[in-house]
């Protein structure tokens, strides 16, 4: 773990649970068809980040959000926090890059990318629930 970009964090099970419940709400929002694809993508991506943060908190750390690259770090550390396979990390990192293009360049999000983001967020939520995080 990149110690200079992580700090110790004593998260309570209740705070981890709250973050996972928020991820579940965001996944519900991502599936709502009455909002734009981009907003649905943002909600699904946010669910991914909330799950990744919950996993990191459960290991006793959090990122320095004042430092650039904290989203990338939380995704890249998933193999250590949740035993996520490297091929999944590659997909999640591609979704992170798409989120940046959408947020900072106004790029649109394809239906296929939205679907992938929803699938990945759902799978991460299942992983954190199966791991018993926040219980």
Give residue spans per PLM region:
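Terminal alpha-helical segments
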Residues: 1-135
């Amino acid at each position: 773990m990149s110690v200079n970009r992580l700090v110790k964090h004593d998260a309570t099970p209740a705070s981890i649970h709250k973050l996972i419940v928020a991820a579940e709400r965001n996944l519900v929002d991502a599936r709502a068809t009455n909002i734009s694809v981009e907003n649905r993508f943002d909600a699904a991506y946010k669910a991914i980040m909330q799950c990744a943060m919950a996993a990191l908190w459960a290991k006793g750390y959090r990122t320095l959000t004042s430092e650039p690259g904290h989203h990338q770090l939380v995704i890249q550390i998933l193999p250590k926090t949740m035993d996520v396979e490297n091929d999944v990390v590659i997909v999640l990192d591609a979704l992170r890059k798409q989120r940046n293009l959408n947020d900072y360049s106004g790029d649109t999000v394809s239906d296929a990318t939205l679907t992938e983001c929803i699938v990945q967020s759902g799978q991460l939520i299942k992983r954190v629930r199966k791991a018993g995080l926040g219980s």
